[in-house]
């Protein structure tokens, strides 16, 4: 994912961004001794595992290497995310459904998405649902639930750090298989909010806290 985007930015816009390995090489040359890495992933998926493996290759190049956790790591993270999202969207202010688009993955960490939905609903926000682009639940699963509840309107928003291609095309795009059009074909009016999680101050604070709590890799 990230390497493909780095390549595209360089070819299309002439913008050069280091890969993780390139950034680490730069820090080694600069003589850095202590390294703290804070990824901006939502879950502990394949890319997080890959990052750990890359960092392990550099353990002998630094005196210490510490790694922060993704957004959703421990139980308090789920509570903080739900509280923050409710402050942004005010779930009880409307009878409309709120549907969040997660990335999804074939990694077992995909379980974070249904777990998040379960905890949101357990807090009484029974009009809030989580779907994913590449995992479970899919938009068809969410649509089925909304139809069972005779829902007529839904607000769609990304559960991703950046509102990029998935949010603009897979969620809000004009293609017939966009989430917006899938819902509207089912008689559910869909209103899309194109803002990534990274634009919210409370999410930025969560990542800053995770960086402060970064654990040493051995």
Question: Can you describe what each PLM-predicted range is?
Answer:
Residues 1-218:
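Active-site-proximal alpha-helix that buttresses catalytic centers in soluble enzyme cores
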């Amino acid at each position: 994912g990230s390497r493909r985007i780095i390549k595209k930015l360089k070819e299309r816009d002439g913008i050069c961004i280091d890969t993780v390995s390139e950034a680490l090489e730069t820090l080694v040359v600069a003589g850095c001794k202590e390294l703290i890495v804070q990824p901006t992933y939502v879950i502990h998926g394949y890319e997080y595992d890959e990052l750990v493996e890359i960092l392990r290759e550099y353990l002998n190049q630094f005196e210490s290497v510490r790694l922060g956790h993704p957004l959703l790591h421990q139980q308090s993270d789920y509570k903080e995310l739900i509280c923050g999202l409710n402050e942004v969207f005010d779930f009880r202010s409307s009878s409309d459904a709120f549907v969040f688009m997660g990335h999804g993955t074939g990694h077992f960490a995909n379980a974070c998405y249904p777990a998040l939905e379960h905890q949101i609903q357990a807090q009484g926000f029974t009009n809030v649902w989580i779907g994913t682009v590449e995992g479970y639940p899919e938009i068809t699963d969410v649509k089925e639930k909304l139809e069972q509840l005779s829902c007529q309107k839904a607000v769609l928003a990304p559960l991703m750090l950046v509102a990029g291609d998935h949010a603009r095309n897979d969620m809000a795009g004009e293609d017939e298989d966009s989430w917006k059009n899938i819902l509207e074909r089912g008689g559910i009016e869909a209103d899309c909010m194109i803002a990534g999680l990274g634009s919210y101050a409370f999410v930025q604070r969560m990542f800053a806290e995770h960086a402060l709590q970064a654990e040493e890799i051995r």
